Amino acid sequence: MSRELVNGVTVLGNLAIDVINGAPRSPGGCASFAGVALQAAGGRGRIVAMGAEQDHTLFAPLRERFGDLVMILPADRTSGFRLDYEDVDHRRMSVDAIGPVWGRAEVEAADPDTTWVHLAPLLRTDFPAETLALLSERGHRVAYDGQGLVRADRLGPLVEDSHFPADLLTHLDILKLAEDEAVVVADGEFDAAVAARLGVPEIVVTYGSEGCDIHVDGTVSRVPAAWRVLDVQTTGAGDMFTACYVANRAAGAEPTRAAELASELVARELEKRLHVGSPDPV
């Protein structure tokens, strides 16, 4: 089922309605934060997201800002989360609503035509292993946000565990894990041996304002954060980082350089929040 693809990245993921520190509902999900990342990276990029039609008006500013870069598909429900920040690197989360599942019909409706597809699951059930296999069969290289490995599809306080199907890893080319997710997956310290056991060719473990580690071919490279941005809430920072990282990898950047560019983008965007006080859809 392979076809001619163009160099670039298509981001697939569910929309989310976020309630942050008790504030009014705001747009969430990777689609709400990836646009600025794709623009910064340049090249071919597209975002396809799903959510209930009655919620689409909340995401109108996203479509107004990015135009044809963003496509929103209808679904029977929209993901929902509550986030309460303790500091720039720590927060408490709960699940208000479990979002739709991406299957063959949804992939065909999105119809990605880029060499890379970045999957941005909010919970473990968003992208089943069969969907990852389908994307691989279509000829795409697949990047995957590791919160989809560890986040259980359960309402209430967010539960993270390692009970993910092993075949979720089979068709991945890049796996991104936040520090807490890496600890869950490794059942302790995440090191080169754990990376080798997972079998994904390229694994990026992020440490918030401390930077990230990149595991490739048995080696580990540390990339420091571009600069620290303090006293700002960081919703969407991981989405921006990963979308920018994958877009730069699709454009031919080496892993370390892709991480540097992604880190610089996130720092710039977080600095903007110091002045506006909220995570605009970017």
What are these regions (language model features)?
Residues 1-6, 159, 189-282:
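Conserved phosphate-binding/catalytic region of the ribokinase-like
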Residues 2-8, 16-25, 40-121, 125, ...:
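Conserved N-terminal subdomain of the carbohydrate kinase-like
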Residues 13-15, 240:
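Active-site metal-binding loops of divalent metal-dependent hydrolases
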Residues 36, 81-83, 211-215:
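Short beta-strand scaffold segments in enzyme catalytic cores
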Residues 36-44, 248-251:
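Alpha-helix C-terminal capping segments
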Residues 38, 178, 238:
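Short, conserved phosphate/pyrophosphate- and ester-handling motifs at nucleotide-, phospho-/glycolipid
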Residues 48-50, 145, 206:
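Generic beta-sheet signal
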Residues 116, 120-192, 211:
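Conserved beta-alpha-beta core of the PfkB/ribokinase-like small-molecule kinase fold
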